[in-house]
């Protein structure tokens, strides 16, 4: 619980350091709404997407009302879009990234956390590394692959390890 609070605080600090003002934030893969709740408490106008109905119900008990799909936000744009350990689960990366780009305001910030298959943990545990998580993790990323994936229409501002973000080392 302490690690989760610390991680949420670090995520808010990261967003605040990359965005020049607190505005509309969309969290894709919002789970039970913990990050949305923390963002709301820190003066962000929060929206979220979570396909899992039970997770949305838990979030609703925290007064965080999540949508089922990013399709619900067609025509809207956000100052910040986050994907915390979501990208590796999505089957159609190219079209998903295009859809996310349309959701960003000009000069908006996209923050993506993914497991790093070049991390110390991955090298140490090799084929037993927890984040390989097949079949749920469809993709595996490194800093280089993430840079290449987003280089076409976006400017990479920063890559950094996210300590305690998950039980494995993340980008």
What is each residue range found by the language model?
Residues 1, 125-134:
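Short glycine/proline- and charge-enriched loop/turn segments
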Residues 1-11:
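Conserved SAM-binding loop and adjacent beta-strand
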Residues 10-128, 138-153:
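Conserved SAM-binding loop
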Residues 122, 134-136, 169:
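Generic structural "secondary-structure junction" signal
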Residues 154-171:
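Conserved catalytic loop of SAM-dependent methyltransferase domains
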């Amino acid at each position: 619980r302490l690690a989760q609070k610390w991680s949420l605080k670090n995520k808010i600090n990261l967003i605040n350091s990359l965005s020049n003002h607190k505005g509309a934030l969309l969290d894709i893969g919002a789970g039970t709404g913990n990050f949305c709740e923390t963002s709301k408490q820190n003066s962000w106008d929060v929206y979220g997407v979570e396909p899992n109905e039970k997770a949305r119900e838990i979030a609703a008990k925290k007064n965080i009302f999540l949508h089922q799909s990013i399709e619900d936000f067609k025509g809207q744009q956000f100052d910040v879009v986050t994907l915390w350990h979501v990208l590796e689960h999505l089957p159609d990366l190219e079209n998903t990234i295009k859809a996310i780009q349309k959701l960003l305001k000009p000069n908006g910030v996209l923050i993506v956390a993914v497991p790093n298959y070049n991390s110390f943990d991955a090298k140490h545990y090799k084929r037993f590394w927890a984040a390989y998580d097949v079949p749920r993790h469809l993709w595996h990323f490194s800093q280089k692959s993430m840079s290449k994936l987003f280089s076409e229409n976006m400017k990479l501002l920063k890559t950094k390890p996210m300590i305690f973000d998950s039980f494995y080392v993340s980008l």
